[in-house]
Amino acid sequence: MTTVEHSSELDEEYPVLAEAVERLRHDGFVKLPGVLNPATIAAYEPEITRTLFERNTQTLPLEERSTYYKAFLQVTNMWPHSEAVRRFVFSARFAKIAADLLEVESVRLFADQGLYKEPGGGITPWHADQYHWPLSSDRSITVWVPLQGTSREMGPLSFAVGSHRLELGRNIEISDESEAAVQAALDAAGLEVEDGPYALGEVSYHLGWTFHHANPNRTDTPRKVMTIIYVDADVRVTPPVNPAHFGLLEHVIPGAKVGGLLDTPGNPVLWPPAAAS
């Protein structure tokens, strides 16, 4: 395991302007410039990458995978396996932004995910994350942190503007079917899609019911992304109603009790930070 010198930037506050909060309310997502400086990314990226490949279980070549598994290498809950990854995921900077944008006093960790879209990796089908989560509230948000500048050719995350306010596609798991059905619904609703590149250090936050997608990686460089999912600290676990819920309760939030707070050891409060120290 590589030793990574801790970056104080991860503990420092980032000013969240009222305009950003309003944009999240209206659009369902917001992109924030300069959340991390290049030195912080350069310090943590190698250990995040090492941990992802150490924990990765996908061994099939791209051409033999389903659409979903062509989208990226995905590893969930990396933080228990690396002290450097834990510091990155437990960042007070990221967590306070999440609380400010959600307009709640406190947020806890739901899960982290490394999402590495390989060279030649396919689309990430349209989907809304919260379909997969048995939660009592829609106060959930994900920070999407590219570990390099991300051009359109690499397949940056794209968002259907305002889709979190529409009752569409909320019963569809991420799949070929969700790609077709959600795209048709978005076209019918006339929603704009934001699919711009990300500068190095820029991140995005999106709500659990915001529909998002990514195009293929048409470059010869992996699109390396770390994500952290936050929920209102007062959220409760609801009875599972679809296969994704059952799998998540078993593998992602083990120990969570239906009807109870999501207060397992794997779901610490990250803002305010004293509870996570």
Name what the model sees in each region.
Residues 1-26, 33-126, 132, 171-172, ...:
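Non-heme Fe(II)-dependent double-stranded beta-helix
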Residues 113, 128, 145-149, 161, ...:
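Short, structured patches in soluble enzyme cores that scaffold and shape functional sites
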